[in-house]
Amino acid sequence: MRKWYFILLAGVLTSVILAFVYDKTKANEEGSGDYLYVSPNGSDQNEGTKEKPFRTLAHASEKAAAGTTVMIREGTYHETLDVKHSGTDGKPITFRNYENENVVISGESVANAEYETPLIRIHDKHDIAISGLTIQDLSVSSEEATAIGIYVSGSSSHIAIKDNHIRGIKTTADEGNAHGIAVYGTGSMKDIRIEDNTVEKLTLGASEAVVLNGNIDGFTVAGNVVRNNNNIGIDLIGYEGTADKNDYVRNGVVENNTVYQNSTYGNPAYGDEYSAGGIYVDGGHDIEIKNNTVYDNDIGIEATSEHKGKYANAIQITDNKVYNNAYTGISIGGYDKKRGGTSNSLIARNIMYRNDTKGLYGGQLLLQYDTKNNTIEKNILTAGDSRLFIGNDFTENEGNTVNHNVYHKEADQDGIWMWKKKEYDSFSSYRKATKNDQQSIYADPMFRDEASYDFSLDPDSPARPVIE
């Protein structure tokens, strides 16, 4: 009798355990605990489960605690998302699309505002992730207002913005402002990650598609596509008065991005100027810009400071492909004597190919006002129609090292080099007068297929011993 009793008891316990495991698994899948669900067909009176989802992003944001993933079901949400709570270390709060469903946050119904108007706002929060969303169609008409797709501000940290598509954010004011992704370190920020997003077709006025500004220490901008915008693609800014202290972006990496067709030409804030950088460091420090593909912008990559007496310092611009940009390929130094400059930076192993497409005499490499103690080496430069390899129309140029570069020699084409306002129409006269490029060569680098922008070198390329 006792034997059968224990067998029966064991069976009951097993059933209870299995039921508990099933219920726990079902709860995790459906929203009780780690997951909340939102759907256009839901109700904020629901429980937030998969079967009974919430209706609004706002309600989900109020309910989401550390470790919660808010699964957003397919549809268009005509509302803004204000992230209300922080996650914790190892337990972020995540807002993302469910599986591969198409989730759109639309600004079409957002009232025209007078100040910052973001579709997603993260202020003074930490351990937050935004992923897999399309953020679009927000417009402002006032010069005092700024339309923003995703806006991070205050002392936020450990923020991940990944796999989103941002488009159609715009200002219609001639001197207005708009951003796709804007991170403003008004307080102390760290660990900001912007990865694998597409940011396109923005009307930006005087602002930038993707910007980090102020007191930000530690960031990654990687794998993004930034294209077809009417101002700067990616901007890293300091010294604008955004933060009370440490007012400059620093200690970050910008890598593996594809940035193209960003131009201010025709933008009412600039008129007929070609002044939009694909990637721009304006007063940042200790930043790596590497392995990016940057083409068909006004300026490929630029590093300087727009503020007198300030510098873009310790910037490493390496292993980038920079081609067919309107004004110049890579630029350092301020655009006039009222600006700051570039110091202690490295430009190495880049391809600068047929930039200066508008004949603006920016060449492939441009040194402007106040450049000092920079190293320019192991690059391959192919001139455009202007035939200018290096432009340097300022004498404020000291301690810069230029050597071990390859200048592409082409049949029946001469090159031009400029240094401290003096122009040289032969490689030998340029080297003799400036003492630059003593171990550099003027030769055909033998690209594998330059017509297809494949700049890998043939095995017998004379460039190999110089740059490798």
Curated annotation (Swiss-Prot):
PbH1 repeats: 125-154, 156-185, 189-214, 216-238, 249-283, 284-305, 312-334, 397-420
Principal cellular location given in the protein's record: secreted
Keyword tags: Repeat, Secreted, Signal
Signal peptide residue numbers: 1-27
GO molecular function: carbon-oxygen lyase activity, acting on polysaccharides
Name of the protein this chain belongs to: Uncharacterized protein YwoF
Highest taxon, organism lineage: Bacteria
Intracellular or extracellular location(s): Secreted
InterPro entries the UniProt entry points to: Carb-bd_sugar_hydrolysis-dom, PbH1, Pectin_lyas_fold, Pectin_lyase_fold/virulence, Pel9A-like_beta_helix, Polysaccharide_Lyase_9
GO CC annotation: extracellular region
Any single Pfam family the record assigns to this protein: Pel9A-like_beta_helix
SUPFAM superfamilies associated with the record: Pectin lyase-like
